[in-house]
């Protein structure tokens, strides 16, 4: 990774707590800040809640309004990452968290920030930055879902491709100004630069998919400019499904004495209940094989990944002509259209979605239980984000990758090595639906 531009990153302490989580045990490394403050004779609440673990959401002692919303969502027991993170994050501890897709990382920062929020008219208290517009839209919806019994809390989403004047109008009116801002870096930087938004009261600063946001130099510089517009005394939380050793030091420069949690370090791909297969075939055989799979397999919703916008459009036309009603989403369509199609798919208006990698990160649609790599991607890391659309939140799911050339074979080999997983060839006789469908 290039180190260009790192010299102006904010320098904070490199001391951190690190928790390595797997299915059997939790190991805590390093000195907690509790111990450090005892030595220094100081009292600092950040990092002082190590070892608090809860088995039910009620044990977190959240606001009654949040507890009611959680019950309405049907949640009772926190996931592994929620269990280890929420008890400290609700008390203001900085967090660096890597956990595989589908373990509820979004709920960690949504619940934690809502728990701490004391809304003041006209003041932005929470900033959430993510790399994709669809993801920003989805995070906003999670805030709406969990704040349903907090009528005074307002949330807004800002991203490029829409008139900035509308954003400015919303922000300058105290009756409409949000307390929680979810945004992509470019648009939020523009609002800060033009003094359309005041971030001097921010108490919580969150970056979702932090590796993607910070590994691109331009996006990282946008984040730095936004970060400098916020108070130094605030909570910073960062989350991602993949967090390489190279990007972690970059993340840490934004953090103070963070709690670090890595669930399945190096993102070893053990997505709960997800069956993974590949199919070797010629390029010209892909359409016929895809139609056969859609006929033979049982699924609630399926997402099919392709490598380009033109292929997404052509494949969608072919599927619709073949009596497989499908919707397509890609980065070259207008933002309003992308959001509308995402919502239509999420609302189950269509069961088949053909997409480029615009849907490959963070997008959460619970009914998806089949992911097909029509075109295998070029890099191993993105595999986790693609197939992670299926089998989320511990449910079963199925991922199938088409392998049509030597380059695909090399990528498949890298995926298996990178994630320490064995991907089997799809059996000619098919597979038992009970292996990838919930009862």
UniProtKB/Swiss-Prot annotation:
A motif (DECD box) lies at residues 208-211. Residues 273-434 form the Helicase C-terminal domain. CDD domains: DEADc_DDX39, SF2_C_DEAD. InterPro entries: DEAD/DEAH_box_helicase_dom, Helicase_ATP-bd, Helicase_C-like, P-loop_NTPase, RNA_helicase_DEAD_Q_motif. It comes from the Eukaryota. The keyword ATP-binding applies. Residues 1-48 are annotated as: Disordered. Its EC number is 3.6.4.13. PROSITE patterns: HELICASE_ATP_BIND_1 (PS51192), HELICASE_CTER (PS51194), Q_MOTIF (PS51195). Residues 1-19 have a biased composition (Acidic residues). Residues 29-40 have a biased composition (Polar residues). It is found in: Nucleus. Belongs to the DEAD box helicase family. DECD subfamily. This is ATP-dependent RNA helicase SUB2. It comes from Candida glabrata (strain ATCC 2001 / BCRC 20586 / JCM 3761 / NBRC 0622 / NRRL Y-65 / CBS 138) (Yeast). The gene is SUB2.
């Amino acid at each position: 990774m290039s180190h260009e531009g790192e010299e102006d990153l904010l320098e904070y302490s490199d001391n951190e707590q690190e928790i390595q989580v797997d299915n059997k045990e939790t190991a805590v490394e390093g000195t907690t800040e509790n111990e450090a403050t005892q030595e220094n004779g100081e009292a600092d609440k950040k990092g002082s809640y190590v070892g608090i673990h809860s088995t039910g959401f009620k044990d977190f002692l959240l606001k009654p309004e949040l507890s009611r919303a959680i019950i309405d969502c049907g949640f009772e027991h926190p996931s592994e990452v929620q269990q280890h993170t929420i008890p400290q994050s609700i008390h203001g501890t900085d967090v660096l968290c890597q956990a595989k897709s589908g373990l509820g990382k979004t709920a960690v920062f949504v619940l934690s920030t809502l728990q701490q929020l004391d809304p003041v008219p006209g003041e932005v208290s929470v900033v959430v930055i993510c790399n994709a517009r669809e993801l920003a839209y989805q995070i906003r919806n999670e805030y709406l879902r969990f704040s349903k019994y907090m009528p005074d809390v307002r949330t807004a989403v800002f991203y490029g491709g829409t008139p900035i004047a509308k954003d400015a109008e919303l922000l300058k009116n105290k009756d409409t100004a949000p307390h929680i801002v979810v945004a992509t870096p470019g648009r939020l930087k523009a609002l800060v630069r033009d003094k359309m938004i005041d971030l001097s009261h921010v108490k919580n600063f969150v970056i979702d998919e932090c590796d993607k946001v910070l590994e691109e130099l331009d996006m990282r510089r946008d984040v730095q400019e936004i970060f400098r517009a916020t108070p130094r005394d605030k909570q910073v939380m960062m989350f991602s499904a993949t967090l390489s050793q190279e990007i972690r030091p970059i993340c840490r420069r934004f953090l103070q004495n963070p709690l670090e949690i890595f669930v399945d370090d190096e993102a070893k791909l053990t997505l709960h209940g997800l069956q993974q297969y590949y199919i070797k075939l010629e390029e010209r055989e892909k359409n016929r094989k895809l139609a056969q799979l859609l006929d033979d397999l049982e699924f609630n919703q399926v997402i099919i990944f392709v490598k380009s916008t033109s292929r997404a459009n052509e494949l969608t036309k072919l599927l619709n002509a073949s009596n497989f009603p499908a919707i397509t989403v890609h980065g070259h369509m207008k933002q309003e259209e992308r959001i509308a199609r995402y919502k239509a798919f999420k609302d189950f208006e269509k069961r088949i979605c053909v997409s480029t990698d615009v849907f490959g990160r963070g997008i959460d649609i619970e009914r998806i239980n089949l992911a097909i790599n029509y075109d295998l991607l070029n890099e191993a890391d993105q595999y986790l984000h693609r197939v992670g659309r299926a089998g989320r939140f511990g449910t079963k799911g199925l991922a199938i990758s088409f392998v049509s050339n030597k380059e695909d074979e090399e990528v498949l080999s890298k995926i298996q090595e990178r994630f320490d997983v064995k991907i089997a060839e799809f059996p000619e006789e098919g597979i038992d639906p009970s292996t990838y469908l919930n009862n």
